[in-house]
Amino acid sequence: MTLRNIPLIGMLSAVLLTVQVGLAFLPNVELISLLIIIYTLILNKKTIYIIITFVLLQGLLYGFGLWWVNYLYVWFVLAIITRIFKKETSPISWALISGFYGLSFGALCSIPYFFIGLSNGTLESGFNTAFAYWINGIPFDLVHGISNFFIALVLFKPIYKLLDYLYKKFNIVQ
């Protein structure tokens, strides 16, 4: 990481926060997933710093509640998935990955509830608590998955091309 990367990380984190706040009035419709996919494809490991900054900004803006614990890992899961499929070039592939990620978001976010349920003393209680949380959010996960799919299908290529162009134009060092 170079000194030159710090403003880049700050700006791209601010973009994540801005689009999140800007679309907050639409439940589970977001550009964060698509942007993290594109950031990971182009910026590789720098995305880690962008995610950390974004998550800290979210906590400062909205408070450090239980929802925030989810953010400590869910966006990193998406970055890891992106790294696994980094050879994919088709917008439809990324739309499917983004859509599936949106569908699974509630399941990923149910993990802390498993541990809360464990505090009642049994493994079954942990699973029941996490399962109840996940089932309760399925309508939101459906919206999240469908909107992620269409957002990525339409915007993946233009945003990827723009960020890749800027990355090369300003000779941002790996």
Provide a role label for each language-model segment.
Residues 1-3, 84-95:
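Membrane-interface helix-boundary motifs at transmembrane edges
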Residues 1-42, 46-53:
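Hydrophobic transmembrane alpha-helices
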Residues 36-43, 76-84, 102-103:
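Alpha-helical transmembrane segments and their membrane-interface exit regions
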Residues 48-59, 93-103:
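Central hydrophobic cores of alpha-helical transmembrane segments
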Residues 68-69, 90-174:
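Membrane-embedded alpha-helical hairpins and interfacial helices in multi-pass inner-membrane proteins
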Residues 33, 47-51, 55, 140, ...:
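Pore-lining transmembrane helices
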Residues 17-30, 53-88:
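Interfacial aromatic-anchored transmembrane helix boundaries in multi-pass membrane proteins
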Residues 41-44, 81-89, 157-164:
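Structural signal for the C-terminal ends of transmembrane alpha-helices
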